[in-house]
Structures are given as C-alpha cells and as structure tokens.
Amino acid sequence: MARIPEEVIDQVRNQADIVDIIGNYVQLKKQGRNYSGLCPFHGEKTPSFSVSPEKQIFHCFGCGKGGNVFSFLMEHDGLTFVESVKKVADMSHLDVDIELPEERDTSNLPKETSETAKMVEMHQLTAKLYHYILMETEEGAAALTYLKERGMSEQMMASFQIGFAPNHHATITSFLEKRGMDLQLAGTAGLLSERDDGQMVDRFRNRIMFPITNDRGQINAFSGRLFDRDDGPKYLNSPETPIFNKRRTLFHFSEARQAIRKQEEITLMEGFMDVISAEEAGVQNAVASMGTSLTEEHADLIKRLTNRAIICYDGDRAGIEAAYKAGTLLVERNRLDVFVLQLPAGKDPDDFIRASGADKFKEIYKQQRMTWTAFKINYLRKERNLQNETDKIAYIDDCLREIAKLDQAVERELYLKQLADEFELTIETLKQQLQQSLKNTHKERQNHSYNEPPIDDSFMGMIPQEDSEMLFSFEQPTKKLSAHTTAEQQLMKAMMENRDSFLLIKQLLGDTEFYHDNYQALYTYLIGYFAEGNDADPHKFMDSVPDAGMKGLISSLEMVISPDEQGKTQFEDYIKSLKRFKLEQAKKELEQQLAAFNRENDKENEIRVMLEIVQLNRKLNSGQLD
C-alpha cells in the first residue's frame, strides 16, 4: 500500500486552497466569511453547502457531509486518500513527488465499492488499448485516415483518447482475461456481451471509440461510431450499468469543468464530434448529452457549476426543437440564463467548423447569440400563418407572455418595440395588454414551488433529534441549541483544537460519557488519536477517522463559533450541564416507568421507582450531580 510522508501531506494541505479546489465542482458564491453553493452530494434547489477558506473545510447543512479538501475528493471522486492527496497537489500545481501504485488496491473497500473500482479500471485499460490500436496498428489505419480526413488532429485524438475497436469478437475479452479480470464483471460493466452459448465476447467491434467519463473524470462507458458501412446503428453506446447512467452523463463535462468555471458559462451541443471540433476551434466549455434529450439530472449538474448556458444544436428542424426543450428545462426548472446559437439550416457545429473554419465559428459564437426570449419569439412563429388574423393575435399574445417574464423594463421595451414595428401597432396598446400578462406571471411565480428531492438521511441519525432542525439549517437558527448539545459541541471542539484542553477535559469528565452516541464515538477516536502521539490538528484528526459520518461531524464542529477564552471554569460548567441533562433524562424514564406500574397496580415497583425519583430530585436541587 502506497504511503506519503507526513510532511508532504502537510505541505499539500497547507498550500492548497479548498475554495479553489471545490470551485471546480461547485459554483461557489461569497457569503460573509464563507462561500456557499448547491451541494454536490444531494439534490437541492437552495444552497446549503458551505466552504470555509479560513478553516479550509466544507460542510453541507442539508445532508451533513463534511470534511477537508482531501475528504471532499475522496467522497466526490471515489478516490483513496493517497489518490486524493496527489489530485489536490496536481490541481494546485504543487511540485511534490507522489507515486501511485500501478494497480489500485481495492482489498479494503466494501464489495460494492471494490467492484465499482474494478469496473472503472477495466474501462481505463480498455480505452488505452483502443487508442493504441487506432494510432499504432494496421487494423486502426482506416479509422485513423477517416478521422484525419474529417479534420481531426492527432492532438485531439490523444486528448479525447479516441480509439478503435477492431472487428474481432475477443480483442477485449482476451485482453482483460490475461490480466486476471472477471469477465462476468466486465459484462456487467458493459464492455462484453454474453452469447446464447454463454461465451463472453466484445460488445464493440469495427467502430471508432469515444471514451465517456463521469463527472469525476473516470472513464465509465464508451460510444462506438460506424465509419465505413451501414449495417448497424451509427452510434452504439454502452448499456446502463452500475457505473454509467445516460441521464446523469454529459460528454466532456469533467474535462470542460475548468473552462466552464473560468468563463462562467457552458455550451451545450448534440454530438461528440461537435464537442471535439469546438475544442479544437478554441471553445473549451462544450459538452454533449449521450444521444438523449437534456434531462433534469443534466440540468442539475450544470446548475451546480454555472448560471449561464449557450445552446448550440444542429441547425435543422430537429435541432431547433431540441434547443427549445433544453432551454425550457434550464430556464423554468433551474433559472439559468440561456442563449441560443442558431447555425445555418442543415449544419451542425462540426459541419460548420469544417466548412467555414474555426475563426468564423468563434466569431458567430461570440457575436450572434440569441437571448432566450428572442429565440422563443422566433420559435413561436412556427407553423403559424401570420397573415391570418387569428394566428396573428395568438402569436402576439404568446409573445407578450414571454416578454412579461423579463425582469428588466428596458428588455421589455425593446421587444415591445419590435412587435409594434412588425405589426404596425402602438407601444401603448401592447403595454396595456402586457400589464395583464405581468399580473398573471406574478401570480404564477407566487404559486410556483419547487419540491427538493429527499436527501440521504444516513448522517442525520448521528445528530441529536431535538437539535437537527437548527444544526442543519443554512439560515441562522431562530432559537438557541439546547444547553447539553452546546456543551457537547464546545467540549469536543476544544479537545480537537488543543491537546492541553483535551487532557484537562478528559480529567474533568472522568467516567462521565457524552449523552449522544456520535459524540462519545468521536471522543473515543480522539483518545486514540492523541495516544498515538499526534498534535492537536482537526485536519489530521479528520484524515485519521475512517468513517465519513464522523468526518461530517468534525466539519460541523469546526463551523461552530466558540467563546474567545475558555478554561477550566467554562469546561466544568459544560460538564455540569451535560450531567444535569443526563439526570433529567433518567428522571423522565423513571416517571414513565412509574406511570406504567401505577396502571398495573404494581405497588412494590411503584414505591421503588418513587424513591429513585426522590433521590434524583435531591441531586438536581442540590447541584451535586455525580
């Protein structure tokens, strides 16, 4: 198992900026001292994900996920700790020597996670073989010539890892088998198919191969394109598998993430070749859906990274319809600013770039974008005879409904003037009609509500039920946390951040346990951490804790604000508060028992419990809580 020197881990942790790293995955906005955005770990419409540049941690107040820069990448990208340190170093352009093992160690991972890792590894190896066959062998020569004739450079082929699957049934089958890979698992992964006789064979044959990556940058599927015959579908995609879902996958999304973030916009295209040609032309923020219409999952993925989308679909009728559907989804569901780049009829971006050149494409890309309203107004003309009075009135009414959705009065005035000029109407007449549309739009917005998908509640069980609503609300709590929860938080936070405080609190606690199991478990981890001779460092402690839920608890504690100076007196008060609460809870349980014995007319136990309650009351009233 690969290990990294502690000083290298410290160097990477101290020099990396968590806001910069997470900003490649989440659209972050400054909010006070922290940054907020939509959580990448659960679906939400309202930001509850917070990143602290001061503490270099993240925490989601919706699902409870949290940690530091390493645990973010481990959770989001499915990396090992060593892999996460290396990726942070690479993303931060740090010159450190970190070597990864040639084969990924999955022995300590759960079976499901281990199989997922193996399926991804199979795809990575297969992609390398396909690319080698295309670039270096006689079998790939015809496909290589075809791609070059389409204007694709070898640099782009290497960048996108484009390959070729030869016309044999066992190229990948034997390749994986020789490496000791499980062929049944390869079938589950979508690389192989099972024949009627039970034999496993290659799924892709005689096709140019486009590797598909997930949003973590891992190859998890392929799309194979025919190029020299028509005896099958033009494109053959990997089937739905445990690691690949078309509804959640955008081609080139991971690779385009940095450009999307830098330019603060994403470009949506229909085909792989469109994206590759756009990349070569200098448009590096382009992605494409996997032969499907844009889905809600795609839209949510986009929304996490940017608020602006440029739709650049094919210029034919089908492309215009697809642009309308995609834009409607992005505008109405995700509130994105959408623009449409309409190409000449019959041209897709790849065709246009090859025919007119990269410079011309970049020119229209920058200068000829239509606003979503302009596109909709043009789209509404479809299949209407504007010489017919009924169609004309209906068209104008539909246009006014769209104009009413605009927030800026100047924009509304601009489109009203265009309508007035085209149909020889006065702006005053249109404004009167617009007022009614504005009222209707306002009512629609008031009545419109978004239902957020349910979150994974596995972490929520770790949070005290009576405090979960306050603890995981992104807004400032309207009431204070309970005294015992505040006590547990402050004691744990103080112990994590200062070894002397840990020793003092440990002595003061004695045999007293934390009331909530999650705090007691974290306390046990902390005892072991300090017993190994470690210094007080919440980040190092977080890295040492294997449980993701505990990492989230640590990050939530780091978000807690503590008084400037805390010492023995304050710690004793916290512990008294904790002991008092535990006694009060014990009293409540006894009172419930007393009521039960009373109903059963069990006098002996009733008297016994009454005496125990009296003793607890004496302790509570006297302040002698031990």
Curated annotation (Swiss-Prot):
Cofactor note: Binds 1 zinc ion per monomer.
GO CC terms: cytoplasm; DNA-directed RNA polymerase complex; primosome complex
Keywords, comma-separated and alphabetical: DNA replication, DNA-binding, DNA-directed RNA polymerase, Magnesium, Metal-binding, Nucleotidyltransferase, Primosome, Transcription, Transferase, Zinc, Zinc-finger
Domain Toprim: 264-346
Catalytic reactions on record: ssDNA + n NTP = ssDNA/pppN(pN)n-1 hybrid + (n-1) diphosphate
Alphabetized PROSITE patterns for the sequence: TOPRIM (PS50880)
Top-level division of the source organism's lineage: Bacteria
GO biological process: DNA replication, synthesis of primer
Cofactor(s) the protein requires to work: Zn(2+); Mg(2+)
Residue ranges covered by zinc fingers (CHC2-type): 39-63
One Gene Ontology MF term: DNA binding
Disulfide bond positions: none
One Pfam match: DNAG_N
Binding site for Mg(2+) 1: E270, D314
Family: Belongs to the DnaG primase family.
Alphabetical list of NCBIfam families matching this protein: dnaG
Record's comment describing the protein's domains: Contains an N-terminal zinc-binding domain, a central core domain that contains the primase activity, and a C-terminal DnaB-binding domain.
Function: RNA polymerase that catalyzes the synthesis of short RNA molecules used as primers for DNA polymerase during DNA replication.
Descriptive protein name: DNA primase
